[in-house]
Each structure stands twice: as structure tokens, then as C-alpha cells.
From Swiss-Prot:
GO terms for molecular function: gamma-glutamylcyclotransferase activity; protein homodimerization activity. It comes from Mus musculus (Mouse). The gene is Ggct. Homodimer. GO terms for biological process: release of cytochrome c from mitochondria. InterPro entries: G-Glutamylcylcotransferase, GGCT-like, GGCT-like_sf. Keywords: Lyase, Phosphoprotein. This is Gamma-glutamylcyclotransferase. The keyword Lyase applies. The modification Phosphoserine is found at residue 173. GO terms for cellular component: cytosol. Belongs to the gamma-glutamylcyclotransferase family.
Amino acid sequence: MASSDCEGHAGQEGETFLYFAYGSNLLTERIHLRNPSAVFCCVARLQDFKLDFGNFQGKMSERWHGGIATIFQSPGDEVWGVVWRMNKSNISSLDEQEGVKSGVYVVIEIKVSTREGKEITCRSYLMTNYESAPPSPQYKKVICMGAKENGLPQEYQEKLKAIEPNEYKGKISDEMEDIIKKGESKLS
């Protein structure tokens, strides 16, 4: 886990922006596929939101073969994630990855708290028009690997591990399979 790079950076300034990741982009290898400028900033908590998994308009993700991560407002709950500092030149690739143009996710601005209690404004994404559905085992694994790699609180990691995946046993993309293999060897 890298040291915190959030000090003195309260929001979207200059040539960079802060992005709060709570799904597959928790894993460094995953976010770097399309967004090589991403630099670990810190672990943070989004208060009064809850993690969910779903299929946009009821259609299963062709990339992940199951529900994909989203968040929704839920008083008293919390979502832990990673804040990445990224070049503004990566906004379009991040939006594309998240399906903003096709309406899968909408961009939201949120305030998250660091472990030290500092509040930071970040860009994040919220899925619209979805039906709850379990993630594939592979998608869940990528999220759990990212949580471990970046030192999310152990209790939250246990919650992630307890998520029941669907029963998909096939392959996902070669690119993602490679990322899982690299991550497993790095984290073992």
C-alpha cells in the first residue's frame, strides 16, 4: 500500500482530479488498464451509502458476467474505497469505462472521509436503472483483491468476502483473467 497522497488536496484542482473507486477499480492493475495516470491517494469512507451489485436495465454485464458494483444512499451504512488522483486527460476514458454515454452510470460528486477524518471531494459513479444481481466470482475476486492490496479496513474486507457471487464458471476477458493472475501472485 502506498503512502497517502491526499494531504493538502481537498478536491478537483489544476490538472488532476480525485476519483473514489469502490468496485473493480480498487485494484491498481485494473484501473491502470485504461487510466495509467491513476496514483493511489488514500483509503476513504463514503458515509450513508451502501454497496450493491446490479445489471443495468436488467442486462448482465458482458465483460463480467454478473452484477457490477454501484452505490445507493442508505443512512447509517458506509462504503470504503480508494481515492485515486488522476490526470484530467483521463476523464473521458474513465467515463467510457463506466458507460456514462450509454447511461449505465452517472457522474456524481461526493464527499468522503479519510481515516484521519479529513473530508475530500471526489468524482464517482452511480448506476442508474438497475436490477440487483450478484457479481460473478471473478468480479468479486477483483474487488476483494483491490481491497486487500490497498488496506481497506479488515471488517469491510470480510463483508466483501461474504458477498454471495453468482454461479458463473466460464471465462471473462483474457485481459481481466491476466489481471486476476497477476494480482493473486502479488498478494500471496
